[in-house]
């Protein structure tokens, strides 16, 4: 990393300057990153059903979002591990159903944005380029200096660098913080940020579930809702998991315009790790109330094969797109 790049973390960069430093579209996230954790020694015992990648629905593919963790690029600087991520805000169109399309802002061409993942204590560097036509920023939940809080707007065609230590461990999020924040978040500028604890959690099939809403007619009321970007996707394309295998779900509620929703799992109960900041669960339940930006780790395993629904227990929200199914399948004996 060149000195001028390292020392410029508080500056706003123009697109040409970032391109000169290697900030090009070539870094776009690939599905290969999703297997980095599962292929590690600690996760060797975890079996994942063959993934059925469905056709992309505009700006996102919920099946790829489900198990896709972006671990960034690891570097060593002055004896410290630096984990570098690159995010580009852009514009695209998502198909909410066969008749309704919606213009959104996206991050790295997808909604929700990439699920960033690091380990507690690492130094995090976020290279952010705004190509979305309006001023935007990235605000990360967690602990960091004020100048890294992502409040300052970054103009269209410009970029900036956020640097901070990964702390504390848990399930966090990032989102645009330019007013009106509700609109910028609701139109797609958000993602999950996982900081793993120093001691790894037990092996599990890990999935990401982000609840969101769409106000398509600007009346401050959502007409559509979704898990991982696309309404009803996991109802039409159930999430396959193996019978009796531990599932670790990182669940985030980012639904704007609704004060709170619940997460409900059919025919089962889950252990709750509040904000992912504990190593032992606080409660076991089958329905959990979550305010906007609230997130938790939920762990469970299914005893019986079959298809089981999950959804908010505000049924109007569920029936407007925020529902899905787990398809529990027996693991073949080898």
Where are the language model's segments positioned?
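C-terminal segment of N-terminal export signals and the immediately downstream linker at the start
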Residues: 11, 32-82, 334
């Amino acid at each position: 990393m060149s000195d001028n790049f390292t020392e410029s973390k508080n500056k706003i960069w123009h697109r040409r300057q970032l391109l000169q430093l290697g900030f090009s579209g070539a870094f776009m996230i690939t599905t290969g990153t999703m297997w980095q954790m599962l292929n590690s020694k600690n996760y060797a015992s975890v079996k994942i059903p063959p993934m059925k990648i469905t056709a992309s629905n505009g700006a996102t593919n919920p099946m790829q979002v489900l198990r896709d963790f972006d671990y960034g690029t690891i570097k060593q600087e002055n004896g410290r591990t630096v984990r570098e991520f690159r995010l580009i805000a852009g514009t695209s169109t998502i198909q909410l159903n066969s008749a309704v399309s919606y213009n959104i802002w996206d991050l790295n061409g997808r909604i929700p944005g990439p699920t960033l993942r690091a380990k507690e204590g690492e130094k995090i560097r976020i290279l952010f380029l705004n190509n979305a036509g309006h001023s935007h920023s990235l605000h990360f939940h967690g602990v960091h200096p004020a100048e890294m809080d992502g409040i300052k707007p970054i103009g269209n065609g410009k970029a900036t660098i956020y640097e901070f230590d990964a702390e504390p461990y848990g399930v966090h999020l990032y989102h645009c913080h330019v007013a009106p924040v509700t609109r910028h978040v609701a139109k797609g500028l958000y993602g999950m940020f996982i900081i793993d604890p120093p001691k790894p959690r037990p092996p599990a099939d890990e999935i990401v579930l982000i609840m969101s809403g769409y106000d398509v007619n600007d009346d401050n009321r959502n007409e559509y809702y979704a898990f991982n970007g696309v309404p009803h996707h996991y109802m039409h394309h159930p999430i396959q998991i193996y019978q009796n295998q531990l599932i670790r779900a990182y669940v985030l509620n980012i639904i704007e315009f609704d004060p709170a929703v619940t997460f409900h799992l059919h025919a089962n109960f889950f252990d709750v790790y509040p904000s992912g900041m504990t190593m032992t669960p606080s409660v076991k339940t089958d329905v959990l109330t979550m305010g906007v930006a609230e997130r938790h780790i939920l762990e469970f395993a299914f005893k019986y094969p079959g298809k089981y629904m999950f959804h908010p227990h505000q049924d109007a929200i569920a029936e407007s797109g925020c529902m899905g199914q787990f398809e529990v399948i027996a693991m073949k004996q080898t």
